[in-house]
């Protein structure tokens, strides 16, 4: 019931459309109910009169019915058009809300959840929700109006024949609700399995170059086949439940016709019912059966819609671990003095410490370099500064202000990152550079590209800055992508800079170009550099050696070589 309440909340902005839609649905149903009763009344009254009276009344009846069906048609148009648009608008609202929430969720959520499943919730789940949002209330309302209306007329025609039909309907609904619980389970499983299919597909397509380079198409085919077959099994279970549900309801509907014919014939034989009334009963049974069939289909639609909505709520009710404090303030006039004060950290799902008692002081405009073996926590130290994760002990300050007391947007807007794994968005080179400063002028973009030593290369391309980079920048080399990402940070112009192994995956020539760009980028900025190639960080103001036990050594390049310790051993390898 709580799920239904939350679902109803999304009708709020469209109340007027919703109620007009229900009124139109009621008109459609009442017109369908009215015709058999009009026919019955005329058969017993008008059509027993003389010829002249019948001919005189027919034009009035024709015009009245014509107007009635025109009104019904207009109502049907509104229900079909505006009703569907209401559902589409709700789908858009939910999708936007879900997308916005995805962007606010912490890194830990993305570490624990599959992007294919997330895309399934954003697309296919919400489509079924849209269909239910429109057709659910409308079909339920139409069906109830027709069922109640038909029963009233059936009682009005013959009470004795109506009683066994009520018993049949009650038995049918009890049976249907029991089947409904089983269907709900299969629909939820169906959702999970199609999410697995999406995840498998995305994983393979994203890594298609690796797949083909290793000639592992058969392995990927088997992986996809496994998830695809699992989805088929879930569909089979689903259809078994649906088959039992549909066939049992069809059986009960047949029993209604059987009772009407046999018991109605008995009542005629007993003189308790007229032959014409039995024919009218058959008409109303048809009207009565139709909404029952709609309700049966509605149950399937409801299960699809609500199972999708529950998955939607699972995400929406997941709170971000990283969010602004109630009294958070904006970070302004940043100098760039960064301080790690006895910082400790472990992941929320693992108590094993990643960092313990780390203290680093970086004066504004100074540079430090972090070196050490993989897994020692270098990237984690950098990830804590923009609050991709929160410290579990100690504190981090920028210009003396605890970062947990700052708004995330203002904090992150003052930090630029250049990473080893460069991500370029689908679009042009210009679009990707401008990502560092939305709304930047062409002159600003060109200046940033020149600073990153990528302008000349761009101008050699046929389309220049309007060159399409391909998905994830597949049309560019690693060095070209890296320089575009550096241009993006130049355009952002942050006072604090994080360089996370920005040159480790490049060839020597590309590294020289990138290193030159990074040196230019680092001027007068507080810079934290992670590097495996120690030759790139010799000029850092301080080099800190991180091991699994914490900070092992710290000092300048010359000082650490003189100590002949861990750093010297790395350098002389």
State where each predicted segment sits.
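Membrane-integrated ABC transporters
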Residues: 1-32, 47-61, 79-90, 94, ...
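Transmembrane helices of ABC transporter permease
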Residues: 13, 17-27, 68, 135-189, ...
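An intracellular "coupling" helix at the cytosolic face of ABC transporter transmembrane type-1 domains
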Residues: 16, 107-108, 124-133, 137, ...
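Transmembrane helix-loop-helix hairpins at lipid-water interfaces of multipass membrane proteins
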Residues: 18-75, 155-160, 271-275
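Hydrophobic alpha-helical segments in the permease module
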Residues: 64-72, 76, 169-173, 177, ...
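Short intracellular "coupling" helices and adjacent cytoplasmic loop segments at the cytosolic face
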Residues: 88, 95-128, 199-223, 311-331, ...
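Cytosolic ends of transmembrane helices, especially the final helix of ABC transmembrane type-1 domains
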Residues: 193, 216, 240, 288-315
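ABC-type nucleotide-binding domain
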Residues: 331-573
């Amino acid at each position: 019931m709580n799920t239904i309440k939350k679902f109803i909340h999304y009708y709020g902005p469209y109340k007027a459309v919703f109620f007009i839609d229900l009124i139109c649905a009621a008109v459609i149903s009442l017109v369908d109910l009215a015709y058999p009763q009009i026919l019955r009344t005329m058969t017993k009254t008008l059509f027993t009169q003389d010829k002249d009276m019948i001919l005189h009344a027919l034009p009035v009846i024709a015009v009245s019915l014509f107007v009635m069906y025109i009104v019904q048609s207009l109502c049907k148009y509104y229900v079909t058009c505006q009703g569907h648009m209401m559902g589409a608008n709700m789908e858009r609202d939910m999708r936007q809300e879900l997308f916005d929430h995805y962007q606010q969720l912490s890194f830990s959520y993305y570490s624990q959840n599959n992007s294919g499943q997330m895309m399934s919730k954003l697309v296919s789940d919400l489509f079924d929700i849209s269909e239910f949002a429109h057709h659910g209330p409308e079909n339920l309302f139409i069906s109830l109006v027709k069922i109640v209306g038909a029963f009233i007329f059936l009682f009005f025609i013959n009470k004795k024949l109506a009683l066994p039909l009520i018993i049949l309907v009650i038995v049918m609904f009890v049976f249907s609700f029991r089947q409904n619980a089983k269907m709900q389970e299969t629909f939820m499983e169906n959702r999970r399995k199609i999410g697995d299919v999406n995840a498998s597909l995305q994983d393979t397509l994203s890594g298609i170059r690796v797949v083909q380079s290793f000639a592992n198409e058969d392995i990927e085919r088997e992986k996809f086949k496994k998830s695809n077959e699992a989805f088929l099994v879930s569909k089979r279970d689903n259809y078994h439940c649906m088959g039992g549900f549909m066939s049992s309801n069809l059986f009960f509907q047949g029993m209604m016709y059987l009772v009407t014919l046999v018991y109605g014939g008995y009542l005629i034989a007993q003189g308790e019912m007229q032959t014409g009334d039995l024919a009218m009963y058959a008409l109303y049974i048809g009207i009565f059966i139709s909404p029952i069939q709609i309700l049966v289909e509605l149950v399937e639609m409801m299960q699809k819609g609500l199972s999708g909505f529950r998955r939607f709520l699972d995400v929406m009710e997941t709170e971000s671990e990283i969010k602004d404090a109630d009294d958070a303030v904006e970070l302004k006039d940043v100098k760039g003095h960064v301080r790690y004060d006895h910082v400790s950290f472990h992941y929320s799902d693992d108590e094993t410490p990643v960092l313990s008692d780390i203290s680093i002081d970086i004066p504004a405009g100074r540079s430090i370099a972090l070196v050490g073996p993989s897994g020692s926590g270098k990237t984690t130290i950098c990830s804590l500064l923009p609050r991709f994760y929160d410290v579990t002990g100690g504190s981090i300050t920028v210009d003396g202000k605890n970062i947990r007391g700052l708004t995330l947007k203002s904090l992150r807007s003052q930090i630029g990152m250049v990473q080893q794994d460069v991500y370029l968005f689908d679009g042009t080179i210009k679009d990707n550079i401008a990502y560092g400063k939305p709304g930047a002028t062409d002159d600003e973009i060109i200046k940033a590209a020149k600073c990153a030593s990528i302008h000349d290369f761009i101008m050699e391309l046929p389309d220049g800055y309007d060159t399409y980079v391909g998905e994830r920048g597949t049309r560019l080399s690693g060095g070209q992508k890296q320089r575009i990402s550096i241009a993006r940070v130049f355009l952002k112009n942050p006072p604090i800079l994080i360089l996370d192994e920005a040159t480790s995956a490049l060839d020597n020539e590309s590294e020289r170009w990138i290193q030159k760009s990074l040196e230019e980028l680092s001027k007068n900025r507080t810079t934290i550099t992670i590097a495996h190639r120690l030759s790139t960080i010799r000029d850092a103001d301080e080099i800190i050696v991180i091991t699994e036990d914490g900070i092992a050594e710290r000092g300048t390049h010359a000082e650490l070589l003189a100590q002949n310790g861990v750093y010297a051993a790395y350098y002389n390898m």
